[in-house]
UniProtKB/Swiss-Prot annotation:
Name of the gene: ureA
Keywords: Cytoplasm, Hydrolase
Cellular localisation: Cytoplasm
Top-rank EC class of the record's enzyme: hydrolase
Pathway recorded for this protein: Nitrogen metabolism; urea degradation; CO(2) and NH(3) from urea (urease route): step 1/1
Assembly mode: Heterotrimer of UreA (gamma), UreB (beta) and UreC (alpha) subunits. Three heterotrimers associate to form the active enzyme.
Catalytic activity, reaction form: urea + 2 H2O + H(+) = hydrogencarbonate + 2 NH4(+)
Protein name: Urease subunit gamma
Length: 100
């Protein structure tokens, strides 16, 4: 199987997001890379599901709370940007203050 660099990036995001979801389900607080992966995967999934850019940004900002992550992580992530493929093409999705 041959994957483009972009496809490899998405695969890494999804793999780390799956690990993070398992840890979250076990009650383990997420670190910085895990948190970014979960937020990015939520944005990619929303775009793939046919949502608008605005809906994807709004939904991705609600997937994690301060209780889900280690201390200091929300301050380390002022925004998350990911290029997602929507029904009308690729767009850069920016999620501001993704951890409330």
């Amino acid at each position: 199987m041959h994957l483009t660099p972009r496809e490899l990036d998405k695969l890494m995001i999804y793999c780390l997001a799956e690990v993070a979801h398992k840890r979250k389900a076990q009650g383990i607080k997420l670190n910085h890379p895990e948190s970014v992966a979960v937020i990015s995967a939520a944005a990619l999934d929303g775009a793939r599901a046919g949502k608008t850019v605005e809906d994807v940004m709004k939904d991705a900002a609600t997937v994690l709370t301060r209780d889900d992550v280690m201390e200091g992580v929300p301050e380390m992530i002022p925004l998350v940007q990911v290029e997602a493929v929507f029904t009308d093409g690729s767009r850069l999705v920016t999620v501001h203050s993704p951890i409330q």
